[in-house]
């Protein structure tokens, strides 16, 4: 018995000591209790996701550890090309081969980068030392040219949002991480910068906090601490060591020791809708736990009243399993139907307060999108809200024909042939009207214009959307928020979207691809939209209009034009007629092009709804084989028009395929995650895709209610409203729910603010397994707002779920 006791003690000691040692795990990153170090698990340096990355007590505190060509790089700065990544379990190390330039980004690609005439290869290795520290070593194949020495260096970026007000120590000096960058300024390689905040051999970050303290020591060149926000508003703090003349092997050698708190475990996170639930709705909270934890056997539900909390339920907690790096359990309180305010308790953790009531989706849900977000995004208008001016009259000098530009920024390209009668630099009339700024930037993309028009039209058709809270005066280019004008806001917004789509079509004889500024300095502008140009056409600051041959995009636009024609028929018959005629003309120009079957099915479905033309119905039936082979991408569109099809074989085969597809989806979802929707986390938050999936599921249910339940689009809405992974369980819809995203990548991001009704993509994946949604205004991959579905899909889902439980009388 005594031998068994000592054996158990030795085993326990071994397990505990293993938790204190930083070692490689089966996911190919270094792990110990309270610390993870990943190394090129991500490669998205423009988005601060790459290189050496430190996750301390569950929070990503440093990233992008790599060799860069400047002390304070930005989004359009050169980044290396990465090669072979080698994981050495025996030596507890990972090495990464890299080189400059990256030919796929050098003056080409979605956002072309201008690289200098510099070619070199290097390798970075990180290695665990056995005491909770790790080393970083940079080896160059050959010395850098003299002119690049001290300019290039190894940079490690520190996330600023968690450091403001904290302190640092550098050898014998100290300082505070300030909320804003300050001078004195100095010229550095032709650019004004503040210079290093401190220089030395040993840097201690946040020495006052055990949960945040990190020590970085250099065994080679001195360490410099820079504030990367001096030249880039979205910059981070940067720790760097420059590459010196003649350096090759061991050009940089650091030891990094992030402090860890013994026995630390991830705190349970209760994920429940920030808005609440209808009494008859399924109500499940999810609790996210440390992977080593065993779920508590029970949870509690409290009702809130005059005396505070009243216990109304104690119920079994159900283990779901593991997903990403956490363990999950579900808390089901669906049987509670009494209206009121509630809180879920799991151990000593309490959720936010939420409502259960029949009117849960009636107000304060979709309305902020229609009352705030869409008006604020309107181009060619001045947008007022009582005393506030959201933005002044903008872009009235739109737009010049873009010159041939193989690689502009933000994905724009202009071929030598623009397929119009306009020459490069000529002002194209009819573009100084309508449209919405695409996202956190100010361009107009035809697909986001059309997508917004389509969703607004579908909400009018499906749910009778008729809401007036805004005065929109097209003649005076004026918007007054919360000043009704007696006209449906959704109708007016559709007219505004059509003004830019059809205005371009009339002038160009085709669709434009988009309208965007010509200069990168304009593009990165943070401020009032009216500041971008002078509103006087014909000079250098005018935006450019881009054109293209793109039948896929033309088919997307047909969808919006055809839907708009139906809802405008009584209110604006002339515009309705032009919309439908343009949709038909676009169809005639694209219908014979091979491929694009999914897009053709969606376009045909909308044309059928608008015309009931037998030729369109027959064309759709003739595409049966293509529909069956691409059903996951287009089957939902058939749901709205299946009633117009008389072909029994077509209907039977489509129904069988829909049944099989939905069964596969269910199996996939159950294996994916506990969130009730198919979910594959990625570098970008998945919220927009999940919303779109939910809208498509609504139409599947509409066409085949006996085969397709409503749970998918209900769960999609709950995901957006807070039932999603990670410690930040805010609603992705700004201003909707108890806690929502209040610092977003919108046009007012420089003010650390938000636009009510904007919807962000949300929780992103820091590969391989960390869900992250930070409070930071400059993560486009987490908190950007977009048109074309980002916000309007959310509106649609709210209305769909509301109608499900509160059907019209």
Predicted regions: what is each one?
Residues 476-493:
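Acidic, glycine-anchored loop motifs typical of Ca2+
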Residues 199-264, 801:
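Beta-strand-rich recognition/accessory modules
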Residues 162-169, 263-282, 351-389:
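Low-complexity, Pro/Ser/Thr- and charge-rich linker/hinge segments at domain boundaries
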Residues 135-175, 348-360:
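Acidic (Asp/Glu-rich), glycine- and aromatic
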Residues 19-89, 188-193, 202:
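Beta-strand-rich N-terminal accessory domains
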Residues 190-211, 222, 275, 283-350, ...:
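Aromatic (Trp/Tyr) and acidic
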Residues 4-13:
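Sec-dependent N-terminal signal peptides
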Residues 71-143:
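Extended, loop-rich substrate-binding clefts of extracytoplasmic carbohydrate-active enzymes
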